[in-house]
């Protein structure tokens, strides 16, 4: 199966729920005038096992350590960019161990 590349260039919240990547927009989460139904529709989930590369290109991205762990365990590369949108960091899976 072909893995997907996810690019995030705007402020975003990334978390994990039921082994799925949860993507939320901070503008929607913080807006108190919106209805709960609209807020729920603004939340997108993606299966972790379908993701191959994640590019983080904004300083206002919030990502949990659970997301990082799940992505790396599924051999996903995580790339961070600077203010000029140039890659400055790469996080990838390092060690696989067996407890036999």
Predicted segments with their positions:
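N-terminal intrinsically disordered, cationic/polar leader segments
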Residues: 1-53, 57-100
């Amino acid at each position: 199966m072909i893995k997907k590349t996810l690019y995030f260039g705007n402020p975003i919240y990334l978390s994990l729920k039921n082994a799925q990547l949860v993507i939320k927009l901070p503008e929607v989460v913080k807006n108190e005038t919106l209805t709960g139904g609209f807020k729920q529709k603004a939340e997108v989930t993606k299966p972790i096992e379908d993701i191959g590369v994640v590019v983080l290109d904004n300083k206002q991205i919030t990502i949990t350590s659970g997301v990082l762990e799940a992505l790396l365990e599924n051999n996903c590369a995580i790339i961070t960019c600077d203010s000029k949108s140039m890659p400055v960091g790469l996080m990838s899976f390092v060690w696989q161990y067996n407890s036999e």
